[in-house]
Amino acid sequence: MNLRVFKKDIEFFVGEFIDDCALFAALNPHKDADEISQIIDEAVDLYNDLKNKANHPEGNKKAFYTALTKEMFEKIDTLCEKLSAVVSK
Protein backbone atom coordinates (compact mmCIF):
# COMPACT_ATOMS: atom_id res chain seq x y z
CA MET A 1 0.00 0.00 0.00
CA ASN A 2 1.42 3.35 -0.88
CA LEU A 3 0.95 6.53 1.09
CA ARG A 4 -1.28 8.23 -1.48
CA VAL A 5 -3.77 5.35 -1.50
CA PHE A 6 -3.74 5.17 2.29
CA LYS A 7 -4.50 8.89 2.59
CA LYS A 8 -7.38 8.47 0.15
CA ASP A 9 -8.68 5.60 2.29
CA ILE A 10 -8.57 7.83 5.36
CA GLU A 11 -10.49 10.54 3.53
CA PHE A 12 -13.05 8.07 2.19
CA PHE A 13 -13.81 6.09 5.35
CA VAL A 14 -13.80 8.99 7.79
CA GLY A 15 -15.61 11.21 5.28
CA GLU A 16 -18.34 8.61 4.75
CA PHE A 17 -18.80 8.30 8.50
CA ILE A 18 -19.14 12.08 8.85
CA ASP A 19 -21.65 12.07 5.97
CA ASP A 20 -23.66 9.39 7.77
CA CYS A 21 -23.70 11.48 10.94
CA ALA A 22 -24.78 14.60 9.07
CA LEU A 23 -27.50 12.69 7.22
CA PHE A 24 -28.84 11.26 10.46
CA ALA A 25 -28.84 14.71 12.07
CA ALA A 26 -30.68 16.19 9.08
CA LEU A 27 -33.31 13.45 8.97
CA ASN A 28 -33.81 13.32 12.75
CA PRO A 29 -33.78 16.87 14.11
CA HIS A 30 -35.57 15.71 17.26
CA LYS A 31 -32.56 13.61 18.34
CA ASP A 32 -29.80 15.12 20.46
CA ALA A 33 -27.81 17.29 18.04
CA ASP A 34 -25.09 17.92 20.63
CA GLU A 35 -24.20 14.22 20.78
CA ILE A 36 -24.05 14.00 16.98
CA SER A 37 -21.89 17.11 16.88
CA GLN A 38 -19.55 15.61 19.46
CA ILE A 39 -19.25 12.39 17.44
CA ILE A 40 -18.49 14.40 14.29
CA ASP A 41 -15.81 16.32 16.20
CA GLU A 42 -14.25 13.01 17.26
CA ALA A 43 -14.27 11.85 13.63
CA VAL A 44 -12.54 15.06 12.52
CA ASP A 45 -9.94 14.59 15.26
CA LEU A 46 -9.43 11.01 14.08
CA TYR A 47 -8.98 12.24 10.51
CA ASN A 48 -6.37 14.81 11.56
CA ASP A 49 -4.57 12.31 13.79
CA LEU A 50 -4.41 9.62 11.10
CA LYS A 51 -3.18 12.07 8.46
CA ASN A 52 -0.49 13.34 10.82
CA LYS A 53 0.64 9.82 11.70
CA ALA A 54 0.64 8.80 8.02
CA ASN A 55 2.94 11.71 7.19
CA HIS A 56 5.41 10.74 9.94
CA PRO A 57 5.97 6.95 9.86
CA GLU A 58 8.08 5.33 12.55
CA GLY A 59 10.27 2.28 12.01
CA ASN A 60 9.37 -0.33 9.42
CA LYS A 61 6.97 1.42 7.05
CA LYS A 62 5.01 -1.68 6.04
CA ALA A 63 4.36 -2.70 9.64
CA PHE A 64 3.61 0.90 10.59
CA TYR A 65 0.98 1.38 7.88
CA THR A 66 -0.54 -2.03 8.58
CA ALA A 67 -0.93 -1.09 12.25
CA LEU A 68 -2.26 2.34 11.32
CA THR A 69 -4.85 0.80 9.01
CA LYS A 70 -5.98 -1.51 11.81
CA GLU A 71 -6.17 1.46 14.19
CA MET A 72 -8.25 3.42 11.67
CA PHE A 73 -10.85 0.68 11.32
CA GLU A 74 -11.00 0.04 15.08
CA LYS A 75 -11.58 3.71 15.84
CA ILE A 76 -14.16 4.12 13.07
CA ASP A 77 -15.94 1.05 14.45
CA THR A 78 -15.96 2.65 17.90
CA LEU A 79 -17.43 5.83 16.44
CA CYS A 80 -20.08 3.76 14.62
CA GLU A 81 -21.04 2.16 17.92
CA LYS A 82 -21.44 5.62 19.48
CA LEU A 83 -23.61 6.73 16.58
CA SER A 84 -25.69 3.56 16.86
CA ALA A 85 -26.25 4.27 20.55
CA VAL A 86 -27.58 7.74 19.69
CA VAL A 87 -29.76 6.34 16.90
CA SER A 88 -31.31 3.72 19.17
CA LYS A 89 -32.36 6.25 21.84
For each feature predicted by the language model, list its residue ranges.
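N-terminal acidic leader/helix
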Residues: 1-31
